[in-house]
Amino acid sequence: MATDGASCEPDSSRAPEDPAGATAEAPKKEFDVDTLSKTELRMLLSVMEGELEARDLVIEALRARRKEVFIQERYGRFNLNDPFLALQRDYEAGAGDKEKKPVCTNPLSILEAVMAHCRKMQERMATQLAAAESRQKKLEMEKLQLQALEQEHKKLAARLEEERGKNKQVVLLLVKECKQLSGRVIEEAQRLEEVMAKLEEEKKRTSELEEELSAEKRRSTEMEAQMEKQLSEFDTEREQLRAKLSREEAHTTDLKEEVDKMKKMIEQLKRGGDGKPSLSLPRKTKDRRLVSASVGTEGPLTRSVACQTDLAVESAEPVKKSPLTVHVKPSPGSPHVSVKGSGGKPGMDRQASHGELMGSALPTLPPPSASRIEENGPSPGSTPDAPGSAAPPGSAAPPGSAAPPGSAAPPGSAAPHSFHSPCASAPPHPGLNPRIQAARFRFQGNANDPDQNGNTTPSPPSRDVSPTSRDNLVAKQLARNTVTQALSRFTSPPAGAAPRPGASPTGDGGAYPPVGRTGLKTPGVARVDRGNPPPIPPKKPGLSQTPSPPHPQLKVIMDSSRASNAGAKVDNKTVASPPSSLPQGSRVINEENLPKSSSPQLPPKPSIDLTVAPAGCAVSALATSQVGAWPAETPGLNHPACSDSSLVIPTTTASRSAINPVSASSCSPGASDSLLVTASGWSPSLTPLLMSGGPAPLAGRPTLLQQAAAQGNVTLLSMLLNEEGLDINYSCEDGHSALYSAAKNGHTDCVRLLLNAEAQVNAADKNGFTPLCAAAAQGHFECVELLIAYDAHINHAADEGQTPLYLACKNGNKECIKLLLEAGTNRNVKTRDGWTPVHAVVDTGDVDSLKLLMYHRAPARGNSLNEEEPKSDIFDLDEGEESPEGISKPVIPADLINYANREGWTAAHIAASKGFKNCLEILCRHRGLEPEKRDKCNRTVHDVATDDCKHLLENLNALKIPVRISVGEIQPGNYGSNDFECENTICALHIRKQTSWDDFSKAVSQALTNHFQAISSDGWWSLEDTALNDTADSNIGLSTSSVRAIMLGHVPWSSGQSFTQSPWDFMKRNKVEQVTVLLSGPQEGCLSSVTYASMIPLHMLQNYLRLIEQYRNVIFHGPEGSLQDYIVHQLALCLKHRQMAAGFSCEIVTAEVDAGFSKEQLVDLFISSACLIPVKQSPVKKKIIIIILENLEKSSLSELLGDFLAPLENRSTESPCTVQKGNGMSACYYFHENCFLMGTIAKACLQGSELLVQQHFRWVQLRWDGEPMQGLLQRFLRRKVVNKFRGQVPSPCDLVCKTVAWALSVWRQLNSCLARLGTPEALLGPKYFLSCPVIPGHAQATVKWMSKLWNAVIAPRVQEAILSRASMKRQPGFGQTTAKKHPSQGQQAVVKAALSILLNKAVLHGCPLPRAELDQHTADFKGGSFPLSLVSSYNSCSKKKESGAWRKVNTSPRRKSGRFSSPTWNKADPSSEGLKNKTISQLNCNKNASLSKQKSLENDLSLMLNLDQRLSLGSDDEVDLVKELQSMCSSKSESDISKIADSRDDLRTFDSSGNNPAFSATVNNPRMPVSQKEVSPLSSHQTTECSNNSKSKPESGVSRAKSFLPVPRSKATQCSQNTKRSSSSSNTRQIEINNNSKEENWNLHKNEQIEKPNK
């Protein structure tokens, strides 16, 4: 008679009784009872009686040993959690043996089982014996083999000894050799030391010699400098002597002429003629002598350039002097400024009157680092001469000195001009012929005619000095005024001419036409232009090297024997050239830095570019009467009209005449003070043209025509063009025509006038450059367009082979390139050096010009250039960078791209060597490029390339193919996977021609590994809650083994597989656009794709699947949005395919539970799916049923599943369930053994009667603060960012990273605050945050999305949860009462305060937007305007004081990290900062749990009692929430909230019910203090009692209330039942402790450390 629950398995303890059982069975088989005699029958009866007695003894022995040994061996390894042991113990400890019914079968069956076990053991022994025999045979064979091996071993040992002897001899020999070699090494080392010592000595000698050599070099350079200085002085003296000689010769010639005239006059006198001419001759001679006496002796003087007077004029011998030429833009190859004639300094006429010596009325700032430079010896004076005194013969103004800015003219100055006078008049030369005045008047317009800028300048009053001119006063006055006004119009720079930023400065005499590019520079700042020649050395005639101004200034062509080219850069003012020792390209101050006139400022007017004809032809009167000329004492010189005298003008200046009169100090040898002509006292002047007795001939007009064209003076140019007989195609010695000068300087109107006048459009200069070449080089695209329209030769090649297209490319002029290409120019022309336009444009590094040259197509012939171009002809430069082939194919052929110059360099060589990576990339896009082409030095493009360009070339033909991970088709909608992406880009692979399949396989594997590590690491997540990160599993379990297949386009490929073609050829031919990696999914019985799609670690999903397969009844529960539905469906799908692979048919049945889902519907579902089977019917084999019940939180679990709990646990016919059918009949059913039941509950914890269901299911809790939910959002958003950045991980400083981190912190802080408020029903899972937008550079979109999420989801849930808690009537059934339909004023205020606190502490805190932008979005959030100080100032007052408690205080959100404004929240008392939560588990309250919580229970029990007693006595419902909100407001840092995360869900307390008489009766004084000594033994007693008393009575609830714990009465009365049930329930389904009772969260202590229950 076995006890209940005994197992039927045999045991070794029954072995001794086996023979008795065998002998008992034998008589039944061998004897026939009917044939036996009496004696035999008696014998048999005695034997059988003995057997019965023996059998009884066996049974008793078995029973005794069962209790002692069998149970211990069978169940000794189980702990108290085994339900079977609990049942056995209860059964045995219950009633006596007589009352028990046998649970197991007859003891005979036990004996039979023992005998059967013995037979099995005998068979097993036989097999083992046979095996032992075979092993013995093998052992003998091995012994024989061992003996043979020993013999071989002996032989080998003998050989080894022989070898050792031989080796010893060899070792001895080696040792001897080593000793010899070591001796040699020592000797060599000694020699080496000696040689090194000698080497050091030689180095010292060498260094000494080098020092001596450097000293000698310094001496030689000093000597060379002295020799150069002396040579320059000798040159200067020679030039001065030549000038003096030429003047003496000229003077001699004049004297001869006068002698001739005297002779003629004597003859006339003899004839009785008039003698008046003899009176003027001595005067002229005297004047000439006076002028000649001062030539070449004085240094440069500072003169005024603001008055307009005639020049002092001298005659010179033109035949002996060649013109001095100054090129404004010198070429490094043509430095020629030679002074072949006079080389003297400008001097002042010693006979000049005081009133005619003009001082500096407007000082100019000196150039930067200007130093005094004495030319031809030191100057005695340090300041400019006072204008009121005549300069002594040796007096000179220092070139570098100038009056300070803003200083007025010195007292005593007789300057006739001021800031208020637009122009100052000067007296005409006395005795000037009226015909000359008429000639001067001929070229002038009306004095009051508007100029080019539309301005009219009135004529100032004239100043007459000489009384000899009074007889011609009217005519001279009119002529002088007109000339002055016209010159004021022609000599000012044009306004508004935009400077072109720098291009390569090439000179007139070089291989390219001059390219002058300047801008208005900062005043006083010296700038060195790249490519300019070095500055002119001192003591040489010349000017500093500066580019031309934006408006062409006065240019005077001169020659010098020893000086390099020079020019002065003048920005809208009159200045002399800076010293030649200044850095090259130094800029002179511009007009903005000058003192402004108080009179209305007129725009600047164009200046004249004056060039002297090479033949010495005179220039008309327009060029002579200029600002800054010194008044002459000489009454008039009657020279020939067409004088051949040379014009020596050492500097170039421009004036802002009639606007801001400016005086400049002469800063360079040879610098002059006159504005336009700048002729000094020694210089032969232009005024003889005007002083002659006859009209000015047309021989000087071509030079003036060139100047007008170069300066853009349309008025003068049009007047000159209207004259008859003028050669408009006249060229100077450099071959520059007027059209060339106008085109070079970009004067479109002048070009149009000249072209209309039929100027030669293709006239070339001496270097072969046409006007189109000059305009293209300078970038004047309007001139280029005009010249092309007049049929200019677009493919004209200069002497060196440069075409206009080449020059435009060389200087990077994109508009000119475009115009020339549209005109059909030839792209294939080459220069003499073998350079093509492609070479030229690549050499500049201009990407846009290169794209135009390569891709811009010429329009069809016949299209007008003025018509708007069709859009198809315009190449999109920006889009072209990505895929120019998609927009347009290259126009230029491969031969041109690969054309090599004289050195063998292609355009790719140039781009690579200069590091122009963008240009090289564009060249590489041309399919015909040959990167392996070698130059004359046998170097490829890669050999000469920089590092960046080498990397580009190495990836030249590389295919950039994206790698994407696909998880297959994600089932739509209702499973919570709307935000999951089917494919994600992880990287881009560069596949080169040399890439092998092994390399490709490794690259794919490495890319996958890096991607999985990147999305699972927390590299750039700066989270405040570090405790949560410590528990996060950084590895999601994916690797290359998770890959199911890899698709190369549409071709499947596996890692390690090789095709006949290389990867590059394969990708090219199959047009593979992407590599898709397919992960193993549920269809293959794996969960890798589910892991990647949901970011839930793989090992957790596998654990969930194991629980389902093991327990078959599993429910997933967690806060809403925890992806329960998705997880369950994916697990069901995986389980289905696994079972189908094992040969089972499987079916998934899904039911969505709602409030109207009844038990009958559930029964029908079970029956229809064959999950419930009638008792009489056998189950269907090889069939699996998976039933999914969604949204179980919407129904009552106890009502829905209460009757099925036991049948679900024991699935057999022995535990059926009775089902009522609709017709009133009932039937018995049982559950199919292969039926899996899964459910989902969107609820953080269970309450009430739902706890009765809990122990019958396996529960999987998805906590928001634990894996997998805790890290899911972080991993998901990180993967989203990586996908958005095409596989790259952005830096932590990126705005996207900050925004994503903010969204993650919002979710965590929000749940922290909600758990702290005790509203677990409002907790949110990560699902709602998966749709966070990731838009690089647009954080506003994320904030807008957050506001919509707050308004649509978060705020309504929080409002509902707060109202339900605030309006709760403290009834036992938590969750069953709802909020009031009409909440009170206090409840509404609590809700508003809670929303405001949550918004500011959880949502807006940490937002990456600036404060100003955040304020714009704050209004979008619902409930953010509540004054938070009301929460802090609220007291638990009675209803009648409630309105007074809620004071309106103006507060704003608390400033956090300088982002929010400071709060006015009141700080709560630290002792009451938070009401401390306690957790008392009533169902499983053992002593250890009590001790772990005892310390926190003792510390603050009195505070909790005060609140609970107050609530129990009927105080305000919202007091507890207000207290909680107060503590949240008073927390000084957000970490206070995040610290709650570790213990918030584990610390629970039961509501103290207002209708609990047992508890209320024990509390007589709500304010009664409770000491810790009283609390400690009570709490300990209570927990011990609950653990040890298995038969507690209902009255024990009253004694429990005496322990002052807030336990509701309803729970206390059920203590005995729950305790008994818990002791007998199956603990294999491990129960969540904190879900065993209805509970409510309260404020937690910051420092409480509570042990979490084991899952």
Curated annotation (Swiss-Prot):
It comes from Otolemur garnettii (Small-eared galago). PANTHER family: CTTNBP2 N-TERMINAL-LIKE PROTEIN, FILAMIN/GPBP-INTERACTING PROTEIN. Residues 445-457, 479-491, 574-584, 1550-1565, 1573-1591 have a biased composition (Polar residues). Residues 1-30, 201-224, 270-608, 1442-1478, 1548-1655 are annotated as: Disordered. Its main location: cytoplasm. The modification Phosphoserine is found at residue 1515. The modification Asymmetric dimethylarginine is found at residue 489. One of its GO terms (molecular function) is protein phosphatase 2A binding. Keywords: ANK repeat, Cell projection, Coiled coil, Cytoplasm, Methylation, Phosphoprotein, Repeat, Synapse. This is Cortactin-binding protein 2. Residues 1637-1655 have a biased composition (Basic and acidic residues).
